[in-house]
A protein has these predicted regions:
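A conserved short beta-strand
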Residues: 102-116
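Serine-hydrolase catalytic machinery in alpha/beta-hydrolase-like enzymes
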Residues: 1-82
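Hydrolases whose catalytic domains are alpha/beta-hydrolase-1, hotdog thioesterase
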Residues: 94-99, 117
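Gly/Ala-rich beta-loop-alpha elbow adjacent to hydrolase catalytic centers
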Residues: 86-96
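Short beta-strand/loop motif that positions the catalytic acidic residue
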Residues: 125-126, 130-133, 137
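Catalytic histidine-centered segment of alpha/beta-hydrolase-like enzymes
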Residues: 161-176
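Conserved alpha/beta-hydrolase "acid-adjacent" motif
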Residues: 30-31, 117, 138-144
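Acidic catalytic loop of the alpha/beta-hydrolase fold
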Residues: 135-140, 163-164
């Protein structure tokens, strides 16, 4: 499968141990750095990766939450894997209620912790979860992040990272992306 000539599905070199559904951000496609590093790590750990591509600007009148849920549910319905993991970035973290209802493990990059439905769903999910966000991100609530960490979530909180997990400094942004990649790697190693 392709989107705009780009592949949307990736298979690991050996037998697959499950599938990861990747729900991107509003303006952060699956090929952007954080999601691409996550794709590589998932493949290294034996996961098939199914990217969900969307144009969030053309969703019409549909609310964001149900719109994201519909896309993730459709991608999930196409899969036969016994094990499913959800990866969401920003807008894609509106899939948290869907993941929680099914107890799916998840990696949430810059989750919308200021949205009570997202925070509650992450807190209610019995699956393993990693959250990565920054204190310079207005959509990251450090108090909520602490509560979720106390509830069992793994949390990477970067003091100077914004919603793109970056800063105005190119080298520091690369360092932050490396921190996220290491956190994802450690999370998957424990899976």
């Amino acid at each position: 499968m392709t989107f705009g000539g780009l592949p949307t599905r990736w298979e690991p070199p050996g037998a697959s141990r499950g599938v990861a559904l990747v729900a991107p951000g509003r303006s952060y496609p699956p090929t952007a750095p954080l999601l691409d590093f996550t794709r590589v790590a998932l493949l290294q750990h034996g996961f098939t990766v199914q990217q969900i591509w969307w144009d969030s600007l053309t969703r019409g009148e549909e609310e964001s939450g149900p719109w994201v849920r519909r896309h993730v549910a459709a991608a999930h319905a196409e899969e036969q894997a016994d094990r499913v993991l959800v990866v969401g970035k920003s807008l894609g973290t509106l899939a948290a209620p869907y993941a929680a209802e099914r107890g799916l493990d998840a990696i949430w990059l810059t989750p919308l912790l200021t949205d009570p439905s997202v925070a509650a769903a992450i807190g209610a999910n019995p699956g393993r979860q990693l959250l990565a966000g920054g204190l310079a991100d207005e959509l990251w609530d450090p108090g909520v992040a602490r509560e979720l960490e106390q509830g069992g979530c793994e949390v990477l909180e970067v003091p100077d990272a914004d919603h793109g997990m970056g800063t105005r400094d190119a080298v520091r942004t690369a360092e932050i992306h490396l921190e996220v990649a290491r956190a994802v790697e450690a999370f998957l190693a424990g899976a």
